[in-house]
UniProtKB/Swiss-Prot annotation:
Residues covered by region (Disordered): 132-169
Protein name: Histone H3-like centromeric protein CSE4
GO cellular component terms, A-Z: chromosome, centromeric region; nucleosome; nucleus
PANTHER family on file: HISTONE H3.2
CDD domains named in the record: HFD_H3
Annotated gene: CSE4
């Protein structure tokens, strides 16, 4: 649809503020017609260019000769219409001439073939050596994946041999492992189990903790306990943030205090001629220290 531009309406103003809209007149009618004609030419040119590109890039397209003389005449009319449609464009003059010459040569060969031997039309090559061969041959397009599969393809006999060899090796290895496992089980059954007394376990733990400098309490539960205790002493609007090194220092101090307290409580238990540490020993140790309330 052609669009036509219009000028702004003529307004007649009065003293009371009212206005009358005058006649709306088109601007430059001749120039608008020229623009519309140019737009139509450009649109037609783009369509022809697109159709030509589609025909030129169709690699699998074959030439199919007409079966009867009526079909040949209809094809000639379509070709002439296509060529006449391209006469308006100066860009495709050379392409038009080459296409026209090729089509004329094909038509002449077809006519000569019909006159000479109409029954052998399938065996005649209507396209000459100078024209481009647009026929599709599957041998020209090899599949790289198929080549890779063919390189790595093995016979079923070889694969079965490999499976048998691998399975026999695994079976022999499994038999050897089974014999070793049976020997170990027999040795364990014949050996008497060593029984450790509670004092041996205590001595082992004492040596273990004396040689290490690691913390005895895990860090995450201790940090949770510290935050719960501090929440009881702050207001609702306050919010404290703890550094990791501060919590680590508190944990070191608390563990040192507990170790010293338990040492004193253990001495009090030995003074009472006992080995087992009791609650009253810890309470007495705190009272002697002056920390009992």
């Amino acid at each position: 649809m052609q669009s036509q531009q219009y000028s702004t309406p003529n307004l007649s103003l009065f003293n009371d503020g009212s206005a009358i809209i005058g006649e709306i007149r088109p601007i430059h009618g001749a120039n608008q017609d020229v623009i519309n004609d140019r737009a139509l030419q450009l649109l037609q040119r783009t369509r022809e260019h697109r159709n030509f590109l589609h025909r030129a890039h169709d690699d699998i397209r074959r030439y199919e000769p007409p079966t009867t003389q009526i079909d040949a005449l209809e094809n000639d009319e379509d070709e002439n219409f296509y060529l006449n449609d391209m006469n308006t464009n100066e860009e495709y003059q050379s392409d038009r001439e080459s296409v026209k010459s090729g089509l004329n040569s094909i038509a002449n060969r077809y006519k000569n073939a019909v006159q000479s031997s109409p029954s052998d039309l399938d065996d005649i090559d209507f396209v000459g050596e100078e024209e481009q061969d647009l026929s599709y041959d599957e041998s020209d397009y090899s599949d790289p994946l198929q080549e890779i599969d063919s390189n790595y393809r093995e016979s079923p006999r070889r694969t079965t041999d490999k499976i048998l060899k691998s399975s026999s090796k695994n079976y022999r290895r499994r038999e050897n492992l089974g014999g070793e496992i049976r020997k170990i089980r027999q040795e364990k059954a014949n050996k008497t189990a060593t029984r450790y007394r509670p004092s041996d376990l205590a001595l082992y733990e004492i040596r273990k903790y004396q040689q290490s400098t690691d913390l005895l309490i895990s860090k995450i539960p201790f940090a949770r306990l510290v935050k719960e205790v501090t929440d009881n002493f702050i207001l609702e609007n306050q919010h404290l943030q703890w550094h990791s090194m501060a919590i680590l220092a508190l944990q070191e101090a608390s563990e040192a205090y507990l170790v010293g307290l338990l040492e004193h409580a253990n001495l009090l238990a030995l003074h009472a001629k006992r080995i087992t540490l009791m609650k009253k020993d810890v309470q007495l140790a705190r009272r002697i220290r002056g920390q009992f309330i």
